[in-house]
Regions:
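Beta-rich carbohydrate-recognition and catalytic domains
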Residues: 1-109, 117-163, 167-193
Length: 193
């Protein structure tokens, strides 16, 4: 596998450091005439799927998403990795904190675009769950960045880019989220209570 890019970090403070929770996008090293990409299979293991670029059933016009026999796939798989800094400029990998990988059928293509909300109860991570089933918002809670509680999908498809407010307003929790269906209503930022 090769890392194709680092994207959309969630930023927070922990243990007197500045941390980034990076989205890491990976794919297999590509071979001539073949397009290959990773997915999580039903057993939760990474499986590499490959198609011939010459196949009449392949539409690879978008470098991020391909379609084969009418079924869509992402060309990379994303997961989340922590890096830290004492000065906010120079960051280093923290091996004692494991990456956060996709899990289950709603995260077959991985997890993306994480936001980190710091609360008195720890850290709440909202992120995009990506699969052939749907694109929606997932939620994870942690206090120590080693143990996680997964709450599953909290905003239904097609939805992404969720940010929880870190403090209650009028005794209630709020979040911004983005239903993203240009065909039905457009791309707007919504406020959820």
């Amino acid at each position: 596998m090769e890392i194709t890019c680092l994207l959309n970090p969630g930023v927070f403070r922990y243990q007197d450091k500045i941390w980034l929770l990076l989205r890491i996008a990976e794919r297999p090293i590509q071979k001539e005439g073949i397009i290959s990409f990773p997915i999580y299979n039903k057993e939760g293991k990474i499986e590499v799927v490959s198609f011939s670029k010459d196949s009449p059933d392949l539409n690879a016009s978008d470098p991020r998403v391909i379609s084969y026999k009418g079924k869509d796939y992402l060309t990379t798989m994303s997961y989340l990795r922590l890096v830290s800094s004492t000065d906010g400029i120079h960051f280093k990998d923290e091996p004692e904190f494991p990456p956060i990988f996709g899990k289950g059928e709603l995260e077959t293509f991985g997890i993306e675009d994480c936001r980190v909300a710091t609360t008195e109860d720890g850290f709440y991570l909202t992120f995009t769950e990506v699969s052939p089933v749907a694109v929606g918002v997932g939620l994870i809670h942690t206090k120590d960045w080693k143990n996680y509680v997964r709450y599953g999908m909290i905003f239904p498809p097609h939805n992404k880019d969720c940010a929880l407010f870190e403090q209650k307003i009028g005794g209630r929790y709020f979040a911004f989220h983005r239903p993203s269906s240009p065909e039905l209503g457009g791309n707007y930022i919504w406020l959820a209570e």
